[in-house]
């Protein structure tokens, strides 16, 4: 949805310059004219047509809802010609808000169902330990041999966060160096899931949205989050010596 609104803003900026080319020639339109071979397009025509490609790609790839690209083009043409839009600005904003709200609620419901289904199936897999029923699970990938993390200290670690589909949304690996995190400042599922880790251990956390960002934040609403975490070092004041 945010992508759509951003591109709508770009429409408003671009419309005044779409009516003619830089040489003052006649308006170039995709409607009612034969396609011009790319090899004979002017620089302005190439720029204009590429803008159209980018716009169509952006609008057709959104996961929220699909706009009718034909009507979008007609709307642009009508605006250039000085014709009225079918909705007033106020009506448009109201209708867009309703569409956005419905899309958000649908995504919340779908993601929550996917998260709960995943956790229900995942808990029976080999090596998976459930810390909180249907909310928080972990699996040890590599055993650690160092001190045990207890309480809620700072922790020097590497992490990679991904969604159920495997898409990575954040990682400390991009900076190569491990990151020092205050575990009192992160989502509760992350800090709870790390308790008991030994230095050197690699653990995968499976976190229900209730223990993550829920319906707020920059990530898709009600996303189940999966973190692979390697504990490098725990704060000396909050560790116990491994037996």
Curated annotation (Swiss-Prot):
Reactions this protein catalyses: [protein]-peptidylproline (omega=180) = [protein]-peptidylproline (omega=0)
EC number from the UniProt entry: 5.2.1.8
Keywords: Cell outer membrane, Isomerase, Membrane, Rotamase, Signal
SUPFAM superfamilies in the record: FKBP-like
GO biological processes: protein folding
Domain called PPIase FKBP-type: residue spans: 152-235
Principal localisation: membrane
Topology of the protein relative to the lipid bilayer: Peripheral membrane protein
Any one GO MF annotation of this record: peptidyl-prolyl cis-trans isomerase activity
Annotated GO CC locations: cell outer membrane
Family recorded in the similarity comment: Belongs to the FKBP-type PPIase family.
Protein purpose: PPIases accelerate the folding of proteins.
UniProt name for this protein: Peptidyl-prolyl cis-trans isomerase Mip
Species in which this protein is naturally found: Chlamydia muridarum (strain MoPn / Nigg)
């Amino acid at each position: 949805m945010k992508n759509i609104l951003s591109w709508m803003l770009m429409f408003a900026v671009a419309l005044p310059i779409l009516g003619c080319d830089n040489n003052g020639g006649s308006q170039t339109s995709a409607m009612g004219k034969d396609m011009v071979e790319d090899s004979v397009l002017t620089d302005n025509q190439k720029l204009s047509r590429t803008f159209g490609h980018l716009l169509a790609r952006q609008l057709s790839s959104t996961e929220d809802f699909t706009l009718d690209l034909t009507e979008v083009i007609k709307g642009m043409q009508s605006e250039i010609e000085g014709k009225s839009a079918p909705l007033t600005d106020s009506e448009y904003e109201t209708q867009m808000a309703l569409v956005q709200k419905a899309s958000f609620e649908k995504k919340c419901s779908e993601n929550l169902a996917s998260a709960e289904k995943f956790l229900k199936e995942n808990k029976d897999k080999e090596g998976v330990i459930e810390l909180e029923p249907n909310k928080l699970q972990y699996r040890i990938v590599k055993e650690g041999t160092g001190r045990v993390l207890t309480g809620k200290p700072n922790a020097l670690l590497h992490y990679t966060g991904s969604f159920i589909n495997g898409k990575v949304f954040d990682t400390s690996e991009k900076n190569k160096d491990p990151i020092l995190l205050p575990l009192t400042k992160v989502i509760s599922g992350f800090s709870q899931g790390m308790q008991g880790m030994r230095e050197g251990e690699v653990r995968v956390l499976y976190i229900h949205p209730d223990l993550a960002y829920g319906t707020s934040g920059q990530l898709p609403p009600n996303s189940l989050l999966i973190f692979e975490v390697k504990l490098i070092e725990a704060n000396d004041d909050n560790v116990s010596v491994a037996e």
